[in-house]
Amino acid sequence: MINFSFGPNIFLGFILGFGILLLYLLRFVKPEVARDEDLFFVTLGLLYSSILVVHGWRLDPILLFSQVLIIASVLGAGWENIRLRGLLVNLTKKKKEKK
């Protein structure tokens, strides 16, 4: 049974989908920072966000709160990972310039 109505699950699914699409678009904006395994995580994230949008209406408040915490921690860890990748690329460029 599919019940598509606007609720917090739709909002969470769209936030996660937007973050995952930004990870995919990183491949075109900064290809030196992107990795091949990002495609695997993009696929999983889009699947997870679509499940959350379609079947999230079944979540009771405590399960919805757990999804909020999971999504916040995943997006935060992903943001930190991308920043550290950029820092690593900059450090390797500086080392090559010094030699």
Swiss-Prot record:
Main localization (coarse): plastid
GO cellular component: chloroplast
Entry's family note: Belongs to the ycf66 family.
Protein name: Uncharacterized protein ycf66
Gene: ycf66
Localization in the cell: Plastid, Chloroplast
UniProt xrefs under InterPro entries: Uncharacterised_Ycf66
Keyword annotations from UniProtKB, A to Z: Chloroplast, Plastid
